[in-house]
Amino acid sequence: MSARTKEKTKDKTKNDEQTVSTEASAADRNDREKSSSSEPEDNAKETLTKKDSSSKKSVDVLAAMIEQKVQMSGSAGLGEFFGRMRPEITDAFFAALEREADVSKVVPSSLSKLDDGQVVDLLSVGEERTLSQSLFQLEVVTSIPHFYQLTAKQIGALGAQGGYLKAYHGEQVYPFIDPVANQFGRGFDLAYVRINTSGQGVELFIDPFDFDKVSCKVGGESLTGIGLSNAVGVDEITYDDVKTPEQMMEFVVLLIAGAAKMGRFCSSGVDARRRRKLFKTWVRRPVSDNFRHVQGWLLEDDYENYPHVPEALTVFSEYQWFAREVADNMTDNGLGTSVQMEDGPNIESFFNRKYREAAICNLDFITAEAHANVMEELQNEKMNVSAYVDLLQSCQMGIFDIEGDTDTIKLKVYMREVEDYEAELTRMMLFPGDQLYVDCLRTAALVSPNIRQFILSVLIQQATSRVGLIELLPVAEMTASLTSRDNISVSHNMALTLAIGEWKELLRLTNPQQICQKIVCDIMAPFVDGLRMEDSLGVPTPSKLVFSLLGAKVALILTPNLYDYNLHLKAHLVTMILSCFFPDQYGALIASRGYGHDVTGNRIDSIRDGERTKKNCRFATYTVLDPIPNGPPDRTRRKWLLMKRVQEWLLRNDLVRRREIRDIIYRPYANVLRLPGQTYLPRRQAAGAPLPCEVLLNDAIAILEEYRTVFHHPNDRNQGPQDRHALTTLSNLLRWYTRGFAEWFHWVYRPLYLQIALHPIIFWSHRLGQGVWRQFPAVREDRERRFDNHLEGVPFDSPVIAAFEPDVALNPFTLRQGADLLGRVHAQGSTFRGGAYDSASVILLSEYEALYRMTDSEGMVDEYIKTLMASRQLLEGLRLVAELSTGELLRDTPILDYIRTAFCEGRFPSHIFFKILNLFGVKINHGVLAQVGERSIEHRLRGDYRVYYPRPGFLDPALEFIPDRIVVVDPVRPSVRRNVKLIMDAVFDPEFGMIKMRKGVTFSLRPTNDLTFSSFHEIPPIQVEMTGNVNYVYDSETARTRAEYDVQVRWEAPGRIITMNLLVTSSYEILSSMEDILGREVRAFSFVVQDVSKFSGIYYDFMLSAVRKEHAIVWFPNLRGILHHHAISIEKVETCFKAAELAQFSSFLSLRPTALIKLNVVQTTNIRGGILPPSVSKPILPCEGVHPSFIFALMSMWRRIGFAGLPSR
């Protein structure tokens, strides 16, 4: 998405070269805008799996730049390993970056640990299957979407007889005549509608006459049937013998996911010449005068599969481009206002095509309502163009970010240019500008490791795209200036040669990719848990001291945030220097104060091997990072004070600057980032005005002089003339290295760092303070909701730290890497090159101006939008699962009672929980998030796996969870909630739903002479319940043992209900006893089975005997079933159902209370022809029946369900 913005610059000088550069930049941006706009003719699915061409171009450029660097440098690589980057690694790296930039790859979280030396996880990217279409994406449809499908059944002997509707001329003019005639032109027994979606984002098929073919598919997940057969070894899923509710739950989950995608379509697009059109594909049959009024404005429809007669009306158009389009293309065809009456109809009296547009109305009411819900929601997300321009500008460096004569340069400035079509299309441009999106990003980055991984990869891509601006010299060129002075070789000095060898031995070669990587890691320092690596500096010498100090200081300067958020690494760095060069003094310091203190203030006198990360570290403070006292007043005091000076110098960093990104509409939270230093406009530094970084580094040379004096007296026989000469040479020449590094740092590194730090995807701030480094970002479940629902084992029950897995690649620069960068970095126009004065160097301000202007604001904002939408989609999925697991989501829906009874009141099945989360793009497992991995097997088996929407916050040094003040209460889009209710009603509504659930089942063999879908067995008023007591009595007359059943009989009397217990052996005794009590004839009674799980075999034979004698019916008031409709002839009722339902009655013995059974209901009045029997018996029927609204006696009745609904309210 891009606004109509025009890039303008402030002309500070009349530099032709800069003007040309500006024009080229503008041309590039125009090309990018053209390439980023997708053609409407492109396949919608292709746009989901491919990046836009601008991002593809940037990845290609990135690939070319890195490949060039690999060829030029033998040490190029990614991460902390040496050697040339292998082709398979580079291919995977670029492919990973390209895939990670797609929002569909953001949602499934990746919990795998990164391999050593990697920042982008090359192994897990792209492995997880995700939704092929984002739940937030609008699809441009090529045909009118449908939810319902009108069809007919020809069943009886006379069902296919009748005249054929033939409309000769009409079938050639109207595209809908033939399909309607073919479907309904001959005789048919009944017409009905079924759910068979198209263009909805969900493939749902529900035929109330054939439930075995029920299917639902959303993205990569699909389900056939709504029940799972219990037969062992049966592979196919059938509707019969439904005894477990899990698959129904999965079906409901798929419906909810489908509701999140329903209605997200639009029918406007552009043609090949980039002219805006109302629809992509038009119907063109200009034959009939009546149809000519709407020809060209009805979208193509699938009349073959969805036979219907379309309707259309006109509404006023709000767009000027529409009026111009009509004026250009419709004036000469008889529909323009400028034509005469004899050339065509009077448009002024009919409808004015220049001011109105046709609106399709042949959407069924479900599709229309779902579409209206989405469109109404999107109306609230119209782009604020001015705010969008401000967002673009916030990604750019400002004049105040640069120190120097900034009048000689010009920076990139975005300004809004209002044009005619922009003013009109502003209503159509959407932007996730609601503050809720930003809140979702802040929360999702803590909940999902993959969101953090995506942010890391985005910033890595931005940083690595600038890798060509970083120049590193070969090691040989770096040390060449030390072996000669004023073109005179000094290599005969063995002490100097040894010093140079010490420097080379200290080095760990670094490449430009690692520098870009460390910039990103330093920005993301709050989420990095550094991994401490053991190292030793070896034998202490004065020359090694200065190289170590400079290397350590360079590392601390370049990555200040990583060290400040990982004090265990900073303490290790300082310890490594102090213990090597001041062993006695360091030992005395540790002996007197210990290594540090924990959070309770207890002294720590030992370091454990396992304390390599701050997560596993006991320390709250370190002795080597605290102020060191002045030391004992003895002969070693000077050494102690020198150690104190070294420690203070290492910990002092006056270069760090705070940069506040101000609060604007589309970046609603101001954040403050700590930057390594200040950007200086390149210029020749006067003798008395060195750069701040140079001043700071030169203190190490002064320390070297003092160290020689304190530890190696000039008259010390261990230090000969060559040693003193070598150190003097180093002291002089190292100033050239520090100046060259300082120029690179202030001219190149700092602006590169700032450009990455200005990315809008960065939502956090860098904080400092006592104990901040031990404040871990974390998430935790809502304890109150968990306790209210009496749950154990829920995910995030204990606080889960939101940080990257410890990895060397995420660590800050080390001392050895700093020693390498000190001598090898080089900036364009720098005074010194590898410690040698470069008299031919010339500063080209145009190159640095290009550096300041190279930020692609549109690309950064595009990545920001993807992350915002992916974050909300993630939290929306979590919230929907949370509300589904407690039943809140299905409140006021027909399915609520069943879902609450089957799932919410008992243990939530873990495999259903994982399937739900995976469907919504959330991949977790109980070992990582449920915090039950180390608990007992019994606890894991009893664990109730459901999500209650974790809250963001952080763990303080005492590991207490502190909730964040910003809480995303409800990330679910209103349209999703409305469409969930809509689709649940369409599927499960007792009146017009396709799947009608009924509570209450009756079993009877009483005959009837006709059956309809609303037929039911009448329940006699006398109710009999089995108490469970059975006595077996021996009958001496018959020499047999008979069973006596204790039954409780209940009937109504005026004003009261009478209950009586009887001891009977047969149904005759019940009837006779009740006749004696009531004083009247009693023909039948009803057995009542309240709990189907207590329906035992002892009662089965007794009840079945009474039913066969037509003395009783069996009533299961709490048993649930689904109505399965059959339209058959009455002569086939007993053949099809009697024996099967007698067997089904016996299967009730093994049902659970949450079971769903198949309730076959029959319609015999529609079928014509055949032999009519006098009566039939249909054993199992629901307690109450409702005539289904999806069946119509006449063709015109299809309009009852709203097929003429509007696409918007």
UniProtKB/Swiss-Prot annotation:
It comes from Colorado tick fever virus (strain USA/Florio N-7180) (CTFV). The keyword ATP-binding does not apply. Belongs to the turreted BTV-fold inner capsid family. Disulfide bonds: none annotated. This is Inner capsid protein VP2. Residues 1-53 are annotated as: Disordered. The keyword Coiled coil applies. It is found in: Virion. Residues 1-17, 26-53 have a biased composition (Basic and acidic residues). Homodecamer; each decamer is made up of two conformers of VP2, called VP2A and VP2B. 12 homodecamers assemble to form an icosahedral capsid. Keywords: Capsid protein, Coiled coil, Inner capsid protein, T=2 icosahedral capsid protein, Virion.
